[in-house]
Structures are given as C-alpha cells and as structure tokens.
C-alpha cells in the first residue's frame, strides 16, 4: 500500500511553518493516541502521524522529502533513536554503504572535509526509584565527554598562530594508497593521516588540546525528569552531546531511564496494581479496608461474598501519563486468606457453620504431630 503524503497526513500545506506542523501534530496525536482512542486502526493512524511529524519537523529530512518524496536517498520511517544497547554513555557514528564502497574502490561522492558537521550524540543511563519516576525529580549527573577547548576555542592551533596548507596531501585532504586485495592491486583514496582530511595543518598546535580542538572533561548537568517516565524511556537534551566540527552544531545527549520496581505496587504503563489480602470473615460479610494509593490512603468497600480474584478499579488513581494524556488507574486484586491456625472455639464455630450450610466436614490434620496423634488413637 502506497504511503500517503506527509503533508496530507497532518492536514497542512506544503509551506506550513514549524509552529503549524507542531500544532497539527499535537492535535492529531492526542486524538489518535492508543491510550485514548480504542477504535480499530487508531494505532496505525497514530504511527502514521508520528512518522510524518518526525520527517517534516526536521529541516534536513523535510528538504529531502520535498525533493525526493518517500523514495528519497535515505528513506523515511520513523526509526528514531536506538536505545537497545545501554551502558553508561557512548557516541554514535558509522558510515553507510557508500563510505565502505568508496574506501575500497575509491571515487564516489567526496565529502567536503571543511564543511560543518554535527557532533556525535551521547547516551547516559539514569537509575530512578519508583517514586522518582512517578512524581518526577531533578537530578545532577556527571559525564565525561569532549568539550570545545577553552584555549584555542576549537580551532586546534596555538593562539596567535595560523594554519597552512597540509604538506602531506598538499591541501587535498586525502591521499592515494595502493593495496593488495582479493581483486588484485587496487589504488584507493584515504583520509590524510596528518591533517585528518581538513587539508590544513598548524604552524603550531594548541598546547592544551594538541590540535584536536576538544578536551575530554567531566561535565555536570542538571536533568529534569518528567512525571510518569517508565523503564527504558528517554529524554533528549539538545546540544549536550559532543561539539560539532568546523562550526557545526553540537550533538545531543539522550538520557535513558532505568526504573526500580515498587515494593507496594506493580506497574503496567500508567496503571498500577495492588494485592490486598482479606480474611474469610471480611470476604464473607463485607468490610471497609484502608488501602494505599500513590498520594494517600483511601477506604475501599469490600462487598459481602467477595471471592479471590475479584478486582476493583479506582479510576485515575494511577500514574500521570508522561505525554500529558491524563492518569492511569489503580487496580486492587483480592486474595481471600484461609486461616492456618484455629483455636478449638474457632474450629467449633467453623464446624457449626458447615452444618448450617448442609456440609459434612471430614477434618484433616494440619501437621505431622496431629497426624501422629490420630494414628495412635486409631482414628
């Protein structure tokens, strides 16, 4: 099935501004969000809206889409950030097929080594308690990352000196190398090892960063954790990644959350579950029992005749949706607890109850000692 035009999906014109795109996305995503709209097809509609917004809200992706449509050179599909491999924080990089092809055979489209390039994105894993995730918090984190050198301001040259044409590649930024391969001896082009592709070298390198233009430092950042975040969810801190190259923008920092389980509740999305043990008399006669919620304690009415497995729903007593779509519910699961130790009087009452109910009880010993007594009595 052919994909619909992204502008048509959001119901906007092709010259719509970023604010108009965002406004249309918010309106439609709220209408078709799976947590709100339970109609058939709402989930697919929401995915289509999210995919359209991801492309049209990004200047580069939008420009490529306007030129090539869905069959653009990169394709579009709402992949987003891949948070499957966590562990502290790390950079993201790697070239595509064209880079591999070009490095092996040479030729192909050459990148301008002096063009502005966005810095690498970084990732940090933050551990939260259940309460911190539910109510939100602000935490300070420390990460090691590359920052712009304060001495040379990212230039790489010693202040007061200038750059000159690289003597190794004569300013080309790349050098020809011959290699023995399975196809025979091939001539390839590689990035100049002296100037790293810039085509320039320093008269004298910066004494602080040794020509890199960056320093690796420990940086402290304040992270505001929104209410309702769940395990494996993430937030993006724009511009807090590695510094850009040649005046390009800095990358972003993605904070991925690890949420510890609660000792009281079990979480499922925005809903929470609480297990409540009730005694046999409470279940049979009914009662009012005080139970915990996220914010306080409330009285729960247990109707007479309540059985194990009965579930009560307390609307909007769950967790606030992180996207602002209301609150989840609190579900109370009932378990009727059978008494294990009874006094003689309690046993008499239970037998009397059984007789009144027309039941014959063949009482069984509860432990080895009782079984032994009955054995020697010949019972």
UniProtKB/Swiss-Prot annotation:
Protein localization: Cytoplasm
CXXCXGXG motif repeats: 149-156, 166-173, 192-199, 206-213
Pfam family, one: DnaJ_CXXCXGXG
Cited InterPro entries: DnaJ, DnaJ_C, DnaJ_domain, DnaJ_domain_CS, HSP40/DnaJ_pept-bd, HSP_DnaJ_Cys-rich_dom, HSP_DnaJ_Cys-rich_dom_sf, J_dom_sf
GO BP terms, alphabetized: chaperone cofactor-dependent protein refolding; DNA replication; protein refolding; response to heat
Alphabetized CDD domains for the sequence: DnaJ (cd06257), DnaJ_C (cd10747), DnaJ_zf (cd10719)
Keywords for this protein: Chaperone, Cytoplasm, DNA replication, Metal-binding, Repeat, Stress response, Zinc, Zinc-finger
Gene Ontology cellular component annotations, sorted alphabetically: cytoplasm
Domain remark in the UniProt entry: The J domain is necessary and sufficient to stimulate DnaK ATPase activity. Zinc center 1 plays an important role in the autonomous, DnaK-independent chaperone activity of DnaJ. Zinc center 2 is essential for interaction with DnaK and for DnaJ activity.
Quaternary assembly: Homodimer.
Stated role: Participates actively in the response to hyperosmotic and heat shock by preventing the aggregation of stress-denatured proteins and by disaggregating proteins, also in an autonomous, DnaK-independent fashion. Unfolded proteins bind initially to DnaJ; upon interaction with the DnaJ-bound protein, DnaK hydrolyzes its bound ATP, resulting in the formation of a stable complex. GrpE releases ADP from DnaK; ATP binding to DnaK triggers the release of the substrate protein, thus completing the reaction cycle.
Protein name per Swiss-Prot or TrEMBL: Chaperone protein DnaJ
Lineage: Bacteria, Bacillati, Bacillota, Bacilli, Bacillales
């Amino acid at each position: 099935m052919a994909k619909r035009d992204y502008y048509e999906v959001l119901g906007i014109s092709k010259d719509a501004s970023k604010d108009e795109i965002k406004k249309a996305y918010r309106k439609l995503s709220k209408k078709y969000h799976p947590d709100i709209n339970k109609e058939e097809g709402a989930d697919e509609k929401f995915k289509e809206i999210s995919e359209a917004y991801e492309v049209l809200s990004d200047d580069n992706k939008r420009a490529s889409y306007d030129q090539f449509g869905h069959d653009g050179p990169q394709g579009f599909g709402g992949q987003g950030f891949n948070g499957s491999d966590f562990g502290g924080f790390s950079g993201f990089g790697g070239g595509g097929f064209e880079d591999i092809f070009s490095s092996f055979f040479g030729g192909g489209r050459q990148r301008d080594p002096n063009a502005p390039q966005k810095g690498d994105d970084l990732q940090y894993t933050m551990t939260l308690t259940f309460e911190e995730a539910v109510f939100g918090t602000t935490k300070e984190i420390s990460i090691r990352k590359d920052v712009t050198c304060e001495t040379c301001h990212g230039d790489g040259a010693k202040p007061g000196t200038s750059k000159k044409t690289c003597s190794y590649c004569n300013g080309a930024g790349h050098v020809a190398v011959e290699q023995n391969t399975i196809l025979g001896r091939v001539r390839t082009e590689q990035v100049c090892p002296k100037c790293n592709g810039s085509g320039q070298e320093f008269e004298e390198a910066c004494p602080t960063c040794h020509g890199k233009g960056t320093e690796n430092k420990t940086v402290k950042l304040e992270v505001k954790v929104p209410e309702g975040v769940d395990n494996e969810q993430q937030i993006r801190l724009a511009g807090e990644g590695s510094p850009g190259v040649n005046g390009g923008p800095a990358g972003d920092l993605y904070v991925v959350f690890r949420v510890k389980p609660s000792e009281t509740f079990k979480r499922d999305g925005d809903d929470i579950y609480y297990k409540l043990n009730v005694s046999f008399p409470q279940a049979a006669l009914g009662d009012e029992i005080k139970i915990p919620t996220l914010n306080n304690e409330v009285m729960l009415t247990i109707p007479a005749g309540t059985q194990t497995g009965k579930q009560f729903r307390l609307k909007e007593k769950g967790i606030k949706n992180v996207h602002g779509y209301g609150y989840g519910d609190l579900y109370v699961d009932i378990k009727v607890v059978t008494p294990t130790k009874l006094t003689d009087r309690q046993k008499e009452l239970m037998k009397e109850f059984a007789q009144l109910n027309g039941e014959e009880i063949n009482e069984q010993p509860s432990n080895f000692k009782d079984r032994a007594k009955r054995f020697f009595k010949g019972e």
